[in-house]
Amino acid sequence: MSKISKGHSTMLAGGLRFATVHELLDFLPAEERALTEELRELVISEAPELKERLSFNVPFYKLHRDVCFLWPASVIWGGRRTYDGVRFALTSGHLVPGCEPYLQRGGRKQVLWRDLTAITPSDERMIRQLLQAAMAVDRERSQGLR
């Protein structure tokens, strides 16, 4: 983990920049770490073809474009914490049929999310279904069908 040098503006948690997902996990409080790991394992097991990368200091998962991300509440964006747990989000949720009302839109046009403090069997089922649908949309978009 490295500190951002002075003079650079950052919206990352406390000016920290994580080099790996494992550094991020080490930074998180125990409950958030466990939930993030559980969601991460769910995404990887359901969609092993997705590539994991860090962006904005949180894990994003990409096929052709970004499909989803996990945003632990302890990784601050905009200067203050606005939810608890971990946010699971589809980056193009507006194109994925059946997302709402499980995922929320808030005031966003494109990204839809759900804030989780635990994963129930119904959450797991919905996340698996939504990941498959989001990957289908991503494949269609990569072929110019959407």
Per-segment meaning from a language model:
Residues M1-R146:
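Charge-dense, helix-prone N-terminal extensions
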